[in-house]
Amino acid sequence: FPALNARPKELLDEWLAALTAQIDAARRADPGRKVGPFAVNQIVHHSNDRLDHDVALCVKHKVPMIITSLRAPGDVVKEVHGYGGIVFHDVINVRHAQKALEAGVDGLILVAAGAGGHAGTLSPFVLVSEVRRFWDGPIALSGAMTNGAQILAAQAMGADLAYMGTRFIPTPEAKAVHADK
């Protein structure tokens, strides 16, 4: 979830504490049950005046995965790696992918054309192919993912994961307004 969704910013600490407690309780109640990690999205652009605050809370709660966007996340990577977390970074082109990798990210989220409300304009075929020329680590493909056939196509192109967002807006868990659902 995006850290900036917590308003006021102090709410993020409550959310992370509650989420961590619920996950820990689920694991204790059924040790054999697979309980997936969660991720917090951080906008590392200079316009985000909450970044230091929000990253400090993610470090405090040892958020397993941080997803960054809008600038190479060097400082965030160091802090997250300090407690054993991982960082995936949103990229829309090859140059941004290279900069993110130089910053030490663990994986890339390739935001291709069709990613609702995002800046990706490249064909997923081109973007995955070009990035795979220099990166053999984890790639999640974002953009126009709505069903299993598209996920299979993403894997066939060389992506390890499919990143789906819009499809979840109508779910009961999403707090989107009814008109958007």
Regions found by a protein language model. Name each.
Residues 1-138:
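Active-site entrance/lid segments in N-terminal catalytic domains of soluble metabolic enzymes
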Residues 121-136, 140, 146-181:
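Conserved active-site-proximal phosphate/metal-binding subdomains
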